[in-house]
Amino acid sequence: MARLQQSFQQVTLKNLAIYRELNLICQAFQAAEVPLIVLKGGYLATAVYPHIGQRAMGDLDLLVPPQQLPQAATLLDKMGWQTKRPYTIESRLEHDLHLPKLRKVGSPFEVELHWNIVRPGQSNEMLPDALWPHTIPFSSAGPAASAFAFHLQLIHLIIHVAHNHQFSFDLRSLHDIALLLKKHGESVEWHRFVDLVQKWGWQRHAALVCCLICQI
């Protein structure tokens, strides 16, 4: 029990540090007029979980429009978020969905700057511009921050589990989805969920994840 309590306290302190930095990032992006979507744990820890210490985060995932990626990367660099790994924006846009992990001296976490939620060149590729109409305000991160609307949040979590990580995950990933449905299931616009899953070709992934969720 003591170890669990210690772990809970450590996660809580780390997440509080993440949210402090997230608010600073949101302020800088707002001043520069760079739209920002908070992804995965950065949203779920306060919007879905009962307590901020119940959802561990290894990094902070953020998404910006691809055309503003250079500006966003420069802003983060000025705030101390940097990588020693050489890269070019053009190459990353062509082959990946986020920049190399960014680290800041003294920070216990990393930042991943995304412009999409799937890699380019796949049969069920999603254009980044198609994501932005499906957002909601996320006040925990700041007045200008957004998160995916519940139907797209669910799709993203399904893609993250079933496609990006090929079901190589711990139970936290499924727990994220189960809690999202428990807390916000009635607010999910299911017709939009079905339309987008069919449009983007994620039916099989969604069915597999839903079968697993039903057994939790």
Task: Please give the residue ranges for each predicted region.
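Conserved NTP-donor binding/palm subdomain of two-metal-ion nucleotidyltransferases/polymerases, i.e.
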Residues: M1-G58, V64-I216
